[in-house]
């Protein structure tokens, strides 16, 4: 198998750990053992100078917290979508929940400085759902992406708790700093901060590492934003006035 195929296999076991009633060909304990064994082999190949077992043990220790976070994401989707008939439906049928669940796993590996694997996980979710979440993004509990297609969340984005995004939202970089030789300066904060209890409607674009959307705010559809917004704000574009004329 290729590396992406092997990572897809690991990801399948990771989903079984977090949603055993849906993805569980193995029981949860068996899935944890499988993901640990497979992941340790890949980490040993990619990080020959590091202790692969120590890395995987640290990842494994974080799985209960990841499970808790994912459960809050399921609750947020069920509570926030009147079309949701059950939490089981959310887990089985909502692409946003799938993408966020994969992100929660990939983010833990990113935090452990594991190369390549988190990005492959993110791209597997991207190809399946149309939702592109960089594994470096920090996302609080009760996160819900409704519909999902076309959502982009950048590496240094920080998202608070109880945030909801709709399709086509971009949380991206505004511009990239270059050094004296013209090469990009990496490792800088490039993506926005979204505080608690924010709703961002379809096709809104929020850019820049110094941009903060204050808590309890709403960002309307198709808004293009590169400036910070105070808490309890509603941001929207002025509606164009339609011209109605007789065709006679």
Identify what each model region corresponds to.
Residues 1-123, 248:
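Terminal amphipathic alpha-helical/low-complexity segments used for targeting or macromolecular assembly
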Residues 129, 134-135, 140-141, 146-155, ...:
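Left-handed beta-helix
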């Amino acid at each position: 198998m290729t590396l992406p195929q092997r990572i897809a296999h690991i990801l399948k076991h990771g989903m079984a750990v977090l949603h055993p009633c849906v993805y569980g060909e193995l029981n949860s304990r068996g899935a944890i053992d499988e993901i640990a064994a497979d992941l340790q082999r890949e980490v040993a190949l990619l990080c020959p100078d590091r202790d692969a077992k120590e890395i995987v043990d640290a990842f494994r220790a974080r799985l209960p917290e990841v499970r808790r976070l994912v459960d809050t994401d399921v609750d947020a989707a069920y509570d926030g979508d009147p079309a949701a008939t059950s939490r089981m439906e959310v887990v089985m049928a909502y692409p946003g929940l799938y993408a966020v669940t994969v992100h929660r796993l990939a983010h833990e590996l990113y935090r452990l400085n594991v190369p390549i694997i988190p990005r492959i996980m993110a791209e597997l979710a991207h190809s399946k759902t149309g939702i592109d979440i960089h594994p470096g993004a920090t996302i609080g509990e009760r996160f819900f992406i409704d519909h999902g297609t076309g959502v982009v969340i950048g590496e240094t984005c920080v998202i608070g708790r109880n945030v909801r995004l709709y399709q086509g939202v971009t949380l991206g970089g505004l511009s990239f700093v270059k050094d004296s030789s013209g090469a990009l300066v990496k490792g800088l904060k490039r993506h926005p901060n979204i505080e608690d209890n924010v709703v961002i409607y379809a096709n809104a674009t929020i850019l820049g590492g110094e941009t903060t959307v204050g808590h309890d705010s709403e960002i309307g559809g198709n808004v293009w934003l590169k400036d910070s917004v105070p808490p309890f704000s509603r941001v929207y574009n002025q509606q164009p006035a339609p011209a109605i004329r007789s065709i006679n």
